[in-house]
Regions:
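Accessory, non-ATPase domains that flank or precede helicase/AAA+ motor cores in DNA-metabolism machines
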Residues: 1-191, 195-207
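Conserved phosphotransfer active-site motifs of two-component signaling proteins
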Residues: 210
Length: 212
């Protein structure tokens, strides 16, 4: 590839290297899906009494390593996301990783931007169907190496290679897209419950119209 790019033969390149004119080396370059984003940072907001009550209940489960389930009930714009953000910050502060699942249709740039504004790009990995194969590989590698402590994605993100899971959040938990009809068929809730039990961590389900 280099020979074609420079339009020279391999022998010429080796001669230049031998005489010290050039140097060959390998370097990993991450394909970053956030590369063009410039987002102002944001500070956490004061929680209302209801939000604080919900936060405190989940925080206790995180501190006690309890495999518990919580339903955060509220319509769009009621402040569920701020509770998510502060719970993720709690998990981040104890050195563990959070998984934030959202329906594919809701995984908009605006959704991701809010998390980047709070936590920065370096701590976040994103997994969804619109990533290139290379981008997906790099995000997966970032998670496996422990560089990303916040994983945001659609249903397949539940299979991310996390070794220090601290919290699972499933937003819009009633959404039918959390059930995969393709082989292998699976329900994100079932997989989440299994992982939460294995790691002794809580799951937060968020919805305005909870699945019965």
């Amino acid at each position: 590839d280099l020979e074609n790019f420079a339009d020279v033969s391999t022998s010429i390149l080796k001669t230049l290297e031998k005489n010290g004119y050039i140097k060959f080396y390998e370097q990993t370059v991450e394909r970053n899906p956030f590369i063009h984003k410039v987002i102002d940072s944001s500070s956490k907001l004061n929680l209302t009494d209801e939000q604080k009550s919900a936060y405190d209940a989940v925080e206790e489960a995180i501190d006690d390593c309890m495999n518990s389930e919580f339903l955060l009930f509220g319509v769009t714009g009621s402040g569920k996301t701020e509770v998510y953000l502060q719970l993720i910050e709690k998990v981040l502060n104890i050195g563990k990783t959070s998984v934030m699942l959202v329906p594919e249709i809701s995984l908009t740039p605006q959704t991701v931007d809010r998390f980047i504004a709070r936590f920065g790009q370096d701590k976040i990995a994103i997994l969804h169907s619109k990533l290139s194969v290379g981008e997906r590989y790099d995000q997966w590698y970032k998670i496996k190496n422990g560089e990303a402590k916040i994983v945001i994605g659609a249903r397949s993100a539940i299979f991310a290679p996390i070794s220090d899971l601290g919290l699972i959040i499933i937003d819009e938990e009633h959404d039918s897209s959390y059930k995969s009809e393709m082989i292998p068929r699976y329900n994100v809730k079932d997989v989440s419950r299994y992982l939460a039990k294995e790691y002794n961590v809580p799951i937060v389900f968020g919805s305005a119209t909870p699945d019965m």
